[in-house]
Amino acid sequence: MSNHRKPHKSQEELADLFRAELTTGVGRSVKHESAPKHVSGEAIYIDDRLEFPNQLHVYARLSERAHARITRLDVTPCYQFPGVAIALTAADVPGQLDIGPVVAGDPLLADGKVEYVGQMVLAVAADSLETARKAAMAAIVEYEDLEPVLDVVEALRKRHFVLDSHQHRIGDSAAALAGAPHRLQGTLHIGGQEHFYLETQISSVMPSEDGGMIVYCSTQNPTEVQKLVAEVLGVSFNRIVIDMRRMGGGFGGKETQAAAPACLCAVVAYHTGRPAKMRLPRMEDMQITGKRHPFYVEYDVGFDDDGRLHGIQIDLAGNCGYSPDLSGSIVDRAMFHSDNAYFLGNATINGHRCKTNTASNTAYRGFGGPQGMVAIEEIMDAVARSLGKDPLEVRKLNYYGKNERNVTHYHQTVEHNLLAEMTAELEASSEYARRREEIRAFNAASPVLKKGLALTPVKFGISFTATFLNQAGALIHIYTDGSIHLNHGGTEMGQGLNTKVAQVVAEVFQVDVERIQITATNTDKVPNTSPTAASSGTDLNGKAAQNAAETIKRRLVEFAARHWKVSEEDIEFRNNQVRIRELILPFEELVQQAYFGQVSLSSTGFYRTPKIFYDREQALGRPFYYFAYGAACSEVIVDTLTGEYRMLRTDILHDVGDSLNPAIDIGQVEGGFVQGMGWLTMEELVWNAKGKLMTSGPASYKIPAVADMPLDLRVKLLENRKNPEQTVFHSKAVGEPPFMLGISVWCAIKDAVASLADYRAQPAIDAPATPERVLWGVEQMRRLKAAQAQAADAAVEPA
């Protein structure tokens, strides 16, 4: 063993190292732990794993009807194909059929009826995927059609809901509206969004002893998959182990939607005793899985001559699809964020969870918050246009204050408010005032091309609104060579969570992050995990890992104090070294001495978010631990002959507290902005009259590409503003808040179109603002301008 020991360093050399700073701890731009493997193709995803011997491939037959009774289901023809092992229907599920994540409503396979085009009716497992597909399509399925509900407005009018409606109220909105100097009503349709993760839904299951299963699943929620697989099989949770090393993207689409392939594979393995794998082709993935919730919004707003809100009522109708899924919490969050940055005063916010015969819509980055924010930003624009004011001035006038006008419609006080100072900084750095005047002059001289400019804020609440989910666990082992093994309950989907959590542990021990190995998220190492969602991954799991690391560090300090007979204050960890009074040791040497001293070098860690609560009956509380802030200023140019547009420039200022990793945080801000911009401009979901999704692949569903980026994109993180709350090293979440920065592009497009009517009217441009919708807005403004001119001419004609 002595041949493998590192060369001994003198005390002078160790002292020099000790005086240097750690280069890979918190606050450093450490590269993503898998970046080289991502670039080289060596990163292992589930479909890259070697197939198990005797493995089966699973394919599901999907419903072709939006709403129908199944009058005949015969899988006998499936067995005519050599290699078919089993054809499954709902009757073959040994345990619980329903896999609804919160409340029932999601059968694994259709049971007597289908409720959307794309619902899984049966599944076939065979030696090859192609054989399974052919066999599944050979099954005989006959239907009796029922009347579908495909439109969210129809569902709202019929009160066709998956869950009860909910209301937030503060003050007297009816009286305030009645007494307001000005009043506007309007409606808005907000489209959904496909997650379009690069890796489609996939699971691979290996049966183990005693009826257990090892499940390799691309999921944001390993514990939920564990629970549902166990319930589908009728076994206890401890028989099921979920292993999740990395996902090829998630964005919320693998929070609940990943469970069905895992459960189907588990049922196949249960019946056959053979391993099974299911990977959805892109088209089937888009047909089966839910999207971001489309919303229909109705509003009634009262305001004064300056644009200050007096009273408001907003009705938010979320298109939930055929089942509840997570729609209760998603519509709740839309309601929570229907204020965005603004003090609503007297407000009534109603949230409706509408049932339609489409795929069950689900979590997506922002989790309903973006839809609520789009609604209030539409209102701010409409108020400003009606008064002939710059929308930014109306926005600033209605911002939450620091010591007054600072209570939300759900009765949480907005603390540590950075909105005004961030807006002022971005106004100055983006030269908003100068560019606004230049754009007005450009538009006056340009009959076809029109420019638009908008600066919009973001105030996003951080925490799961289901309060019990705000907890996390971690597990750390230190080996006698000084290397560290880390597991936590979060899941890596490319966002850099593992890198940040490793940096947290590196900071605690003051060692290089290269010493730390993070392996797959695994339910038999860290149990009872919360989903990696709600921007909470680092906040929760980083804190849990910090807790575990500090527990071990405390043991090491106590041991060193005893062993070297010094006080604990004489012991300091720094840059891979430990100073014990005058003695300096490499970190690994202290670890070895502690091992010989019979000190435990392993620890679990746990964290739960403090201060938060929400009383749903009273519709009040503090659902969010803190708010993350941001602002974006976007400039666009619109061709009024075609409705086409380009993004010219975007300036972003975003609040991440004390950044754990500036490079990763800037990447998240850039990516979030582009994804939000895509949702509001080009990502259009289209269903035909029979409820079939027609945009079910990249040929018909467009996501932003390189050419769609702003020609000039400037991103800055807010400096010297650590999070006042006791988060992990006073950082802030950065997963979801930047998504809403894309709203600035949508508002800028509307600003350009509004110039056609001298900025005195709000164009009716629903989201996404496709060129077709923009052209409709252009024609609306031109007709309005012509009518205004005609009325003016009539007014000056002699009697």
Language model region names:
Residues M1-S165, R183, H271:
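Flexible, low-hydrophobicity surface segments
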Residues G248-G273, K277-R279, L497-V505:
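Thiamine diphosphate
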Residues D127, R274-C320, K543-E572, N576:
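Phosphate/diphosphate-binding loops
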Residues A43, I202-P207, Y296-D305, G311-L316, ...:
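Short beta-strand elements
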Residues V153-L233, Y399-S483, M694-D708, D712-L717:
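Helix-loop-helix junctions that connect adjacent transmembrane helices in secondary transporters/permeases
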Residues H4-P7, A90-A91, G234-R239, A269-A276, ...:
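C-terminal catalytic domains of large/alpha subunits in multi-subunit enzymes
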Residues R28, S34-G41, Q167-S203, P294-I379, ...:
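Glycine-rich loop/linker segments at domain edges
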Residues L97-V102, A135-A138, C217, Q226-L228, ...:
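Short acidic, glycine/serine/threonine-rich loops at helix termini
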